[in-house]
Regions:
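Core solenoid repeat modules with strong leucine/isoleucine-rich periodicity
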Residues: 326, 345-354, 363-434, 453-456
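N-terminal adaptor/linker regions at the entrance to substrate-recognition repeat cores
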Residues: 2-7, 30-33, 38, 44, ...
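A structural signal for leucine-rich repeat
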Residues: 253-258, 276-283, 302, 306-316, ...
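Intrinsic-disorder-associated, low-complexity terminal segments enriched in Asp/Asn/His/Tyr and depleted
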Residues: 19-20
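C-terminal capping region of solenoid repeat domains
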Residues: 59, 189, 197-212, 399-401, ...
């Protein structure tokens, strides 16, 4: 059944459910039932959603609390720098008895050597004796992800056994974990608990609800068991809680009792009016990331502001970075007000993304008159932009990121940017017309920024005109440049990039080390019957009409392409696979050639990103060429964002 047919059938079934008896509702598939309930609850038609509570339990199980995609991910300070290795006495926790020569070295030298161990080295090390096995585990399990997979369940079982049956004769796996991520993958969960839509479809309604309730209890028990282990992980430094399950008072108590210094709550649903439990003194967090919301089916739904306020009061004395996102409440956003007089003496990094405030007084808590803020990331919400315009210059501010907002206000944000000419990094992810870009960067044909090192701009038009490129080139201090144009989302790529024009216009940027192009597309001289438009370059994957497959396929691959007497359908699939493989390799060769040209123009260039590919510049006394870092394209820009954050956070 096609997608269109399935969607039409679902709509007809929903109409039947809405206009006829309850019996019609019971024959719908679980997906249709949930779709109908979500629609009616959001419209306010279902005034008492508790009557459907067994079925609504599936909402969290199947992640119906919609997670809106980030326009750009926010990197925590702890993620931008590698973890400091633990000393051996903290990992082994007992006197070292191993005779391995490695342990005769000073501890500081051991920590310098271990990063160079390969996976094979670590496997061999684990077989020598107890102490080397614990050292190997400290390298393997410094970062652990619990995602409900079989592997994560084995880790969880091992950690539980260490707590329930402690032994002084055995080293503990729990002592090795520095960074813990809790992120349930729904495919793993559904398979283990047998609640996929296909499995539920064959059950009667009572059996279906019993299966759902059992899965709900299993999920709650799983999350509680993780929280119960946190206090037994003595070296845990970072906790990333990326699970959509409800967050309870008991779970927060366990999190607060742990040794973490950085907490990321990204997506959990707060139970009714959850506040932090009473906690004497402060909570020594250095980094806090909040993207939390109330369940939209909860009749007692309230604002998350009291929860945020209570946690900020505890962490304020030591907090260095605060990230507050409003994506988890996008279905029913509310405006926040923080009436507590909270002071952040060491706060240096603030991110406010899709968070609405009732008034400007709440923002004053994060931007006081006396501040050491170095990095600020905000959208152009009307309240935020007006406050920043009135706030004016922040002498300590080095980095500013301006994201798009539905209630955009450009004039106030531009005024704030102009008030801070000392900026080293400027990221404007909001698409702007070329005239506005010129207004931001220059004044009376002179650059407004003398020390700008990193610049990220997005053109609202389908290309950067020569005048705007000339304006960018006037900022000769630039070392890192990221340009994007046209539509920023979806499959339509509107920027048919002109590399010759860009190289000619920007050649005065002699210190350029990083250059990035996103949403760039290319024209192909393909077959006349094929759609070769740049907008569909990455989707259609059209090859040049004079291209020879022999140049991009191996001998074995060419043999597969030879039309042997095989099934027609299989032959078509095989030819499509080889054609796509050929296109990817041809595309890689084109991007490598362009990047090599850029390295000839910009002699200090070290890294570039174009055509969704990341490349480094390999230089010797004999050559200077671009090389792919990885062969796979990065259409979601995951690797790009990670690299860009590392670079911009270390500018000076």
């Amino acid at each position: 059944m096609g997608v269109k047919t399935s969607a039409t059938l679902s709509l007809r079934l929903l109409w039947t459910c809405q206009h006829h008896s309850k019996n019609a509702f019971s024959v719908l598939s679980p997906f249709c039932q949930l779709s109908w309930l979500v629609l009616k609850v959001s419209q306010g038609v279902v005034q008492s959603p508790s009557q459907y509570s067994p079925l609504l339990n599936m909402l969290s199980l199947h992640a119906f609390q919609k997670q809106y995609p980030r326009r750009q991910p926010h990197t925590m300070l702890c993620d931008a720098t590698p973890l400091v290795p633990l000393s051996l006495n903290r990992v082994i926790e007992q006197p070292i008895t191993s005779t391995l020569p490695l342990f005769q070295l000073p501890v500081e030298l051991i920590n310098q050597v271990t990063p160079y161990f390969s996976k094979l080295d670590i496997q061999s090390l684990s077989l020598v004796d107890r102490d080397t096995n614990q050292l190997a585990r400290a390298l393997q399990f410094a970062h652990v992800t619990l995602d409900y997979s079989d592997h994560s369940m084995q880790i969880l079982t091992k950690l539980k056994s260490e707590v329930e049956c402690p032994s002084r004769r055995r080293h503990r796996l729990g002592a090795c974990i520095r960074r813990l991520k809790v992120s349930t993958i729904r495919e793993h969960f559904n398979a283990r608990e047998q609640i996929s839509f296909e499995e539920l479809q064959g059950l009667s309604m009572p059996d279906r609800l019993r299966r759902i309730e059992a899965a709900k209890q299993a999920e709650a028990c799983y999350l509680r068991s993780i929280c119960g282990l946190l206090r037994h992980l003595p070296n845990l430094y970072i906790l990333h809680w990326n699970d959509a399950g409800p967050l309870t008072d008991q779970m927060m108590s366990s999190i607060m009792a742990s040794s973490i210094r950085h907490l990321k709550l990204d997506g959990p649903i707060l139970n009714s009016q959850l506040l932090l439990p009473y906690y004497c003194g402060s909570w020594a967090l250095e980094g806090l990331y909040l993207n939390v919301g109330r369940s939209f089916i909860d009749p007692a739904k309230g604002s998350v502001a009291p929860f945020v306020t209570s946690i900020l009061k505890l962490v304020a004395p030591t907090l260095r970075q605060f990230v507050w996102c409003g994506y988890a409440e996008r279905l029913s956003p509310s405006a926040y007000h923080i009436d507590e007089d909270i002071r952040f003496p060491v706060l240096c990094d603030v991110v406010l993304d899709q968070v609405k405030f009732k008034d400007m007084s709440s923002l004053q808590r994060f931007f006081p008159d006396e501040t050491i803020l170095r990095s600020v990331s905000v959208d152009s919400d009307l309240t935020v932009s007006r406050f920043l315009a009135s706030r004016g210059r922040i002498p300590s501010l080095d980095s500013l990121r301006w994201d798009w907002s539905p209630s955009a206000s450009e004039d106030e944000m531009i005024q704030f940017i102009h008030s801070n000419p000392q900026l080293l990094c400027l990221d404007v992810t909001k698409p702007l017309i070329p005239e506005t870009i010129d207004t931001i960067l220059v004044q009376r044909k002179q650059p407004r920024f003398d020390n700008l090192v990193s610049l990220h701009l997005v053109s609202q038009t389908s290309a950067f005109p020569p005048q705007t490129l000339t304006t960018i080139a006037s900022i000769e201090s630039l070392r890192h440049l990221w340009l994007s144009a046209g539509a920023q989302h979806g499959m339509r790529y509107q920027w048919e990039i002109d590399h010759d024009l860009i190289m000619e216009s920007l050649k005065s940027l002699a210190d350029l080390e990083t250059i990035v192009f996103t949403r760039d597309s290319y024209q192909v001289n393909g077959h006349t019957l094929l759609d070769t438009s740049p907008e569909r370059y990455y989707m259609n994957k059209v090859l040049p009409k004079d291209l020879l497959l022999n140049d991009y396929l191996t001998e074995d691959e060419l043999k597969k392409a030879d039309p042997n007497p095989i099934l027609f359908d299989r032959s078509i699939r095989l030819q499509d696979t080889l054609r796509h493989l050929t296109w990817e390799r041809w595309h890689q060769s084109q991007m490598v050639a362009y990047a090599t040209e850029y390295s000839q123009v910009f002699t200090n260039l070290k890294w570039c990103f174009m055509g969704q590919l990341s490349m480094r510049i390999d230089e010797s006394i004999f050559w200077k060429i671009a090389e792919l870092e990885v062969e796979e394209r990065d259409p979601t820009l995951t690797r790009l964002h990670a690299y860009w954050d590392r670079v911009t956070r270390n500018v000076n």
